[in-house]
C-alpha cells in the first residue's frame, strides 16, 4: 500500500513536539513508568517536591524526556544543564540560587561534572542549602544560602562512574533500556501523526527494526524516509521505499551501520574473530574508544554479535553468519 506525505514547513515546531509531555505518551519502559508514576503522584498528593531522580542507560532512550515529563507532572519549571559545563562551584551556584520552588533541575551527563562542583550539590540535595565564599584572602568568609526546594534529575550513560556519595543521594533510580520493535512502532506512529506522515504499520516496522532499539534514532530515520520519498519517490512512502531510503544510509536489516560492519569485519578478517582490545579496534576504524563503548558496543552485544571477555572483544558465530563469513580455526 502506498501513501502520500504532506510536506510541511513547520518542522522546527515539531522538533520539540515529538517529545512526550506526559507518561501516557511515553511508550515502552513499562516497569520504570509504573514506579515513576507512583513516585510522582505520591509526592503531588502530599503537596511535596518529588525526591531526586537518577536515570541511566544508553543514549537516545528518553532520559531527557522523562525530566520534561516530571516537570510537566508537578506543574513547575525545568532548568537544564550539562555535566561537562559544571566543572567549578561557580558554574553551579548561579543555577541553584536561580531555581524556584518545585523546579526540576536536570543535569545531563552528570557523571562528567567536576569534583568540586559535585561536592556543592551534596548540601543542596539534602538540605536545600549551599555555601558560598565571599571575598578572598584573610577576609574571606563563608555564607550559607537557603535554596528553594527542587528536584534534581540526573542522566548518565555511565552510572558506574558516579561517586557513591552522589549516587546514594538520589531517592529514585531507574535504568532506561533498549526498546522492542513493538514499542518503537508505537513511537513512530505518534511521530508520523505529528509530522503529518501517512505510513502503515509495515512501513513503520521496517524503520523500527533498523533503529537499534532507540527512539531518537527511529524518529531521525522516519524523517529521512520522509525526505527520501519527497525527493526520489514523488512523496509516496511504503515499506519498499523505506527499505531503499535506509539502504542509502548503509543501514542493514539488523540496524547495523557502516561502523558496526567495519568493527565486525576487522575482528573477523584481521584478528580471527578475537579476542581483540578496544584500543586496537578504535585505531582500526578511526573512532575513539569512548565512542565505540558508548554508541556501538552495547548494541552489538545486545544482538549477540560480540562478547566481552577478560582478554578483549570476540566476534560470535552470529557475527560470522551475518557477514557471510566462515568461522576460521584459531
Curated annotation (Swiss-Prot):
Binding-site positions, DNA: 308, 313
Enzyme Commission designation: 3.6.4.-
Reactions catalysed: ATP + H2O = ADP + phosphate + H(+)
Keyword Mitochondrion: no
Location of the region described as Large ATPase domain (RuvB-L) in the Swiss-Prot/TrEMBL record: 1-179
Principal subcellular localisation of the protein: cytoplasm
Family named by the database record: Belongs to the RuvB family.
Name of this protein: Holliday junction branch migration complex subunit RuvB
Species, as recorded: Chlamydia muridarum (strain MoPn / Nigg)
Gene name per UniProt: ruvB
Amino acid at each position: 500500500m502506498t501513501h502520500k506525505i504532506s510536506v510541511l514547513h513547520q518542522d522546527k515546531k515539531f522538533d520539540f513536539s515529538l517529545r512526550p509531555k506526559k507518561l501516557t505518551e511515553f511508550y515502552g519502559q513499562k516497569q520504570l513508568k509504573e514506579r515513576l508514576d507512583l513516585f510522582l503522584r505520591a509526592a503531588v498528593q502530599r503537596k511535596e517536591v518529588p525526591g531526586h531522580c537518577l536515570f541511566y542507560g544508553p543514549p537516545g532512550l528518553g532520559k531527557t524526556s522523562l525530566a520534561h515529563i516530571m516537570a510537566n507532572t508537578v506543574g513547575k519549571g525545568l532548568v537544564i544543564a550539562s555535566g561537562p559545563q559544571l566543572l567549578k562551584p561557580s558554574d553551579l551556584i548561579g543555577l541553584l540560587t536561580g531555581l524556584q520552588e518545585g523546579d526540576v533541575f536536570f543535569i545531563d551527563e552528570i557523571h562528567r561534572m567536576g569534583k568540586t562542583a559535585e561536592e556543592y550539590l551534596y548540601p543542596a540535595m539534602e538540605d536545600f542549602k549551599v555555601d558560598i565564599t565571599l571575598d578572598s584572602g584573610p577576609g574571606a568568609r563563608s555564607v550559607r544560602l537557603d535554596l528553594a526546594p527542587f528536584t534534581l534529575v540526573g542522566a548518565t550513560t555511565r552510572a558506574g562512574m558516579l561517586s557513591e556519595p552522589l549516587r546514594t543521594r538520589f531517592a529514585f533510580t531507574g535504568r532506561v533500556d533498549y526498546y522492542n520493535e513493538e514499542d518503537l512502532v508505537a513511537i513512530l506512529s505518534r511521530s508520523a501523526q505529528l509530522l503529518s506522515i501517512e505510513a502503515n504499520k509495515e512501513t513503520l516496522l521496517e524503520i523500527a527494526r533498523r533503529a537499534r532499539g532507540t527512539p531518537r534514532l527511529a524518529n531521525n530515520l522516519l524523517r529521512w524516509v520522509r525526505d527520501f520519498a519527497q525527493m526520489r519517490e514523488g512523496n509516496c512512502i511504503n515499506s519498499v521505499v523505506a527499505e531503499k531510503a535506509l539502504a542509502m544510509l548503509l543501514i542493514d536489516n539488523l540496524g547495523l551501520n557502516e561502523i558496526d560492519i567495519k568493527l565486525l569485519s576487522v575482528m573477523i578478517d584481521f584478528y580471527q574473530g578475537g579476542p581483540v582490545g578496544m584500543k586496537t579496534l578504535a585505531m582500526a576504524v578511526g573512532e575513539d574508544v569512548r565512542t565505540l563503548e558508548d554508541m556501538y558496543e552495547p548494541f552489538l552485544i545486545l544482538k549477540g554479535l560480540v562478547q566481552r571477555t577478560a582478554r578483549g572483544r570476540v566476534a560470535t558465530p552470529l557475527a560470522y553468519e551475518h557477514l557471510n563469513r566462515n568461522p576460521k580455526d584459531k
